Amino acid sequence: MLKRILLILSLFVYLQAGNNTDNPAFPNSFFQIGNNPAQYGLKNCGGLHGTIQSFDSKTYYDVSLNMGNFGSVRYRKDSTENFILSGGFPVLHNLFLGANYNFNTEEYSVGMIYTPFQYLSIGARLNNVFEPDFVNLGIGIRPFTKRLTLGYMFASPLNDDFQTTESNSYYYLESEIMDGLLLGAKYDDQQEEIILSAGLNFSHANIMLHKNENSQTASIGIYSKLLNKFSIPKTYHYLTLKGKYQKENYGIFGSGKNFNELILSLKRFQKSKRTKGLVIDVKDFSMGFSELLELYEALLDVRQSGKKIYLYSVNGNNATFLLASAATKHIVYEDGIYNIKGFGMIILYGKEFFDSLGVKINVERVGKYKSAAEPFIRNNMSDEAYEQYSMYLEDIKKIYVNAVSKGRQISKEKVREIIHNGPYTMREAKKKSFMNDFVYPDEISKYITKSEKIKKLKYRDLNEFNSKKSFIYNWQNPKINNAIAVIYATGTIVDGKSQISPFNGNISMGAETICTRLKVAAKDPRVKAIVLRVDSPGGSAYASDLIWHEIQKIAHPKKDKKKAKPVVVSMGNLAASGGYYISCNSNYIFAEENTLTGSIGIFGATLSIEKMLEKIHINTDSLSTDENALFKFAFYDPSETENKFFKKAIETGYKSFIAKVAKGRNMKLAEVDSIGRGRIWMAKDAEKIGLVDEIGDLNDAIKKAAKLAKIRRNTNVSIQPYPSAGYGIKIPFLNVVSYKVFSKYPLLSEIGEKYYSLRLYSDDENLMLLPFEEYEFAE
């Protein structure tokens, strides 16, 4: 490969090439550093660029530094060193302005770039703005593809009357004929010469060579983002599945990896003509069932497009087995364990523990299926809880079996048999033919080269297809007019701001955070519709109602109906109890096939430590001005009057819940009550009884929102969080440190999280909550 590169470079030197291709309409050209400060408005990526030129036995150089919206250039010409500081910013998504200052000449220059279309760019630069002495006017077009750019520039000095004098015209052709291979030409009308340019892009670097009759130039650039890399053979890319994947990242102190970007990278990888296959190294990763199914479908699409997928794991489990179903081959470590074992859940029950302490937890609930408080008042599952959880696990298994059967092209009965007889040693798994071969980690490349009959295998990072980590080749920033705001509402619903748990890194859904996001979207004139992605077991009734109220104001305003914006809910793994409460008044509800929803019900709990105080010989005495002054004092067991009031408050909250569901879903109160009382429903059943409108994913919800907002069908949409990832989320540094420590000790993490969740019960309020968060898959 190195010999091939050196050969090509030697040919490039032979080409008669030249530099100084500074068309102000070319904002992200590899053929020029760019003298138009407006180019920094695109905030493409950081980088360092150096050029050295030999002209008439003299040597000149320049060094430029790009820091996003700002940059600097230091260059030497005619024995003089100059230093220029530049900056640019977007006025609109397609209009950019900029200015720079030359510290040696003490001159200010300004520039403009306007890209009305992705295939057209117009640029201008005025030198020495207070005493203008030179102007550049340029235009660029991309008639067929962003790999081919044609351009024209008019350049002229200016006299004292601001009139052009000795005008000159330049004509440009720049192309990337294949990934990372750059060829270009420039015609100088005044000199009547053609200048040729050529270069190579590597992952984070670029080499350009130029030479004309009088000069020769070489330049090298280093970039913070990934470039289209030069590679002649079709390549294999590498993906390591490790860590916690989630739909929304929470900034540099967040606890997870961006799942959306992973899926988008796979889709771009699938469409690329320069890729041959994907190698997946499965480490310790975790994600919800909805995310696992989405990843499985994305990998299946890659395989069905004709690309090879090799999945490697030391051990295996249910998640590995599903993902391997979408792979071409599953290779493993010989002495590993394939932990396929079905689906189950464990819920801790602590009534005897609390009794032994003398602590009494008084629970009032509506509906026999409202089982969230049972772990505090029972020693085992109630019949109703057992019925519901069994149904849930069987439905999860059914969806899982269907997916494995589809990917492996074997019968569902065979999949059930494999699950029923698990777990397995890897040797047993190979005998049963649901994995392929034994390979040590350092022999993966050797195995693939032998299987694919190729001489040598070099990997490229799948991150090349990650839009946030890749160089921006487009001439426009994404247009956000007629936008659809995607707001992620994830975790247990609490009052205040969202924040991460110090024990397991999970996010809680703060009403203040979600309401703020909704308000920003409602006021943003560019946002025409909102998609609320709900993944929550519920939580605080008060916090849930605050979010419901904010959605009501947006989707169903009382006064000015014209200000209404459609709100579409996309349910993830869970949207139950309070999670359903915040969804019920939206304009349309999508649930995924595995979504658990419903649990329309409410409960409340109070704590009494009267017997505990007796055990440790602490006596209490009291006085009050009124009969009920000591309501909810933990030192005493609740009186009959207090219990009656407590029950009445819970029943009032339940009536309010079903009334809002009835209004939002256009149902009768009795109808909602009959399917409520805490009962959970899988998505297909929820669709049949009217709790959701349709089975579909986040993309389906976005399309529906666009339709309700009357946005044209071909509008580009984004699944990135609005207004931005982590917006309004409180991330205490100590919580992050604590999570990093507890993540190494799963048992302590689980116990700590149970204690942490008790904060919900400490407030004087009612709860809408499930006893578990979601069925999570982990390696």
Task: Please identify what each model-predicted range represents.
Residues 200-250, 344-346, 357, 362-369, ...:
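Hydrophobic targeting/anchoring helices
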Residues 4-13:
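Sec-dependent N-terminal signal peptides
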Residues 479-520, 524-526, 649, 722-779:
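Intrinsic disorder and flexible/low-complexity segments
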Residues 403-407, 436-483, 603, 660-664, ...:
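C-terminal long alpha-helix characteristic of the crotonase
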Residues 309, 347, 351-449, 560, ...:
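Charged, glycine-interspersed solvent-exposed loop segments at helix/strand-loop junctions
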Residues 225-347, 477-612:
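Cleft-lining beta-strand/loop regions that shape enzyme active-site pockets
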Residues 37-41, 57-76, 80-126, 133-154, ...:
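Feature captures outer-membrane beta-barrel proteins of Gram-negative bacteria and organelles
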Residues 2, 15-70:
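N-terminal, post-signal peptide beta-strand-biased segments of exported outer-membrane/organellar beta-barrel
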